[in-house]
């Protein structure tokens, strides 16, 4: 399977497992899991041609580790990023590192400067330990801006942090007082 095919399957899995399982007639459990065989069967019935082996290759090679297979390999879920109401993944609460980062686009800064970071249609704000990863996320939406989050300060103030299966840090919101603009970059 080539990179283009893997990317197409990955985009489909992200859409279905994060946002619209009903688009293929799937039902996810409360933790976001569905049966691999059912997913592959319904994907093929909806015009997407891939098998279990291709799905497993996508899971294994995905750089951002967007998907998790159950220990027995029979179920799959998106690691984080859900917007569907029926999924309420119980991520493990953890103490974060002192600083985390969020990448956004300059066009969103006016809103961020008044509201802080909010989850929007997702369940959580996504943060990373790696500034470069945050910048690459910001580039997807326009001229990137790198924001630093005083995670230690937030945690000490009683804010809960969670970490998804793929290492992404999750928090309900980041009030403006915990944010610092690190850099504007020209793409």
From Swiss-Prot:
- Keyword NADP listed? The answer is no
Task: Please report the name of this protein according to its UniProt entry.
Answer: Probable RNA 2'-phosphotransferase
Give the top-level enzyme category. Answer: transferase
| Database matches in Pfam families | PTS_2-RNA
- Give the protein family: Belongs to the KptA/TPT1 family.
Family matches, as InterPro entries: Ptrans_KptA/Tpt1 (IPR002745), RNA_2'-PTrans_C (IPR042081), RNA_2'-PTrans_KptA (IPR022928), RNA_2'-PTrans_N (IPR042080)
Q: What does this protein do?
A: Removes the 2'-phosphate from RNA via an intermediate in which the phosphate is ADP-ribosylated by NAD followed by a presumed transesterification to release the RNA and generate ADP-ribose 1''-2''-cyclic phosphate (APPR>P). May function as an ADP-ribosylase.
An example molecular function term from Gene Ontology annotations? NAD+ poly-ADP-ribosyltransferase activity
Taxonomically, the superkingdom here is Bacteria
Query: What are the alphabetically sorted keywords of the record?
Result: NAD, Transferase
Among the GO biological process terms of this entry, one is: tRNA splicing, via endonucleolytic cleavage and ligation
Q: Which organism is it from?
A: Pseudomonas syringae pv. tomato (strain ATCC BAA-871 / DC3000)
On whether NAD is a keyword of this UniProt record, the answer is yes
């Amino acid at each position: 399977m080539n990179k283009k095919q893997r990317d197409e399957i990955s985009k489909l899995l992200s859409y279905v497992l994060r946002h619209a399982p009903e688009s293929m007639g799937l039902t996810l459990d409360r933790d976001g899991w569905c049966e691999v065989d059912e997913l592959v069967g319904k994907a093929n019935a909806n015009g997407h041609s891939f098998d279990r082996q291709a799905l497993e290759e996508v899971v294994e090679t995905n750089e951002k580790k967007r998907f998790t297979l159950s220990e027995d390999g029979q179920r799959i879920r998106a690691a984080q990023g859900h917007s569907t109401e029926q999924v309420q993944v119980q991520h493990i609460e953890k103490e974060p590192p002192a600083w985390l980062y969020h990448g956004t686009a300059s066009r969103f800064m006016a809103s961020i400067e008044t509201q802080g970071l909010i989850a929007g249609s997702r369940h959580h704000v996504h943060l990373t330990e790696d500034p470069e990863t945050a910048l690459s996320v910001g580039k997807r939406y326009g001229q990137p801006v790198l924001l630093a989050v005083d995670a230690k300060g937030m945690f000490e103030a009683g804010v809960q942090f969670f970490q998804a299966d793929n290492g992404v840090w999750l928090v309900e919101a980041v009030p403006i007082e915990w944010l610092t603009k690190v850099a504007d970059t020209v793409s």
